[in-house]
Amino acid sequence: MLLHIVARGRIGRGPEADLVDRYIKRIGWPTRITELPDSGGRLPPRDPGTVLVMLDEKGEQLGSMAFAEKLGRWRDDGRREVRFLIGAADGFDEAQRREADLLFAFGKATWPHLLARAMLAEQLWRATSILAGHPYHREG
């Protein structure tokens, strides 16, 4: 199953990009990052089997185990792609939110795009390591 991060804005080079790269390289699943301009630009076409997850302040706050369980369920259901959208500075409007299969939040705080991307990459690594039985995650 493809893990596809689609983010508004360019990350460039720097410590945030290095952190994203570090976690993406650890993930044992196919992973792709698509960067779009802050405004405009088209989302890649969405196949019917694609799960759409929007990072949104109004989203559900999931612990790492619950997030891993969702990924595992989608994988086991034969989903080909889980697409994670990181919006522009103003986030998503209500019409866009209705298109999502899951609205996902990293708590109630607002996070800069670069940190949100790094946090998502880390959570994807953590979730896939949980599903693989790797000892990286310690619940408790």
UniProtKB/Swiss-Prot annotation:
Its EC number is 2.1.1.177. Belongs to the RNA methyltransferase RlmH family. It catalyses: pseudouridine(1915) in 23S rRNA + S-adenosyl-L-methionine = N(3)-methylpseudouridine(1915) in 23S rRNA + S-adenosyl-L-homocysteine + H(+). GO terms for molecular function: rRNA (pseudouridine-N3-)-methyltransferase activity. PANTHER family: METHYLTRANSFERASE, RIBOSOMAL RNA LARGE SUBUNIT METHYLTRANSFERASE H. Its main location: cytoplasm. The keyword Phosphoprotein does not apply. GO terms for cellular component: cytoplasm. Signal peptide: none annotated. It is found in: Cytoplasm. Homodimer. This is Ribosomal RNA large subunit methyltransferase H. Specifically methylates the pseudouridine at position 1915 (m3Psi1915) in 23S rRNA. Coiled coil: none annotated. Keywords: Cytoplasm, Methyltransferase, rRNA processing, S-adenosyl-L-methionine, Transferase. It comes from the Bacteria. S-adenosyl-L-methionine binds at L55, G87.
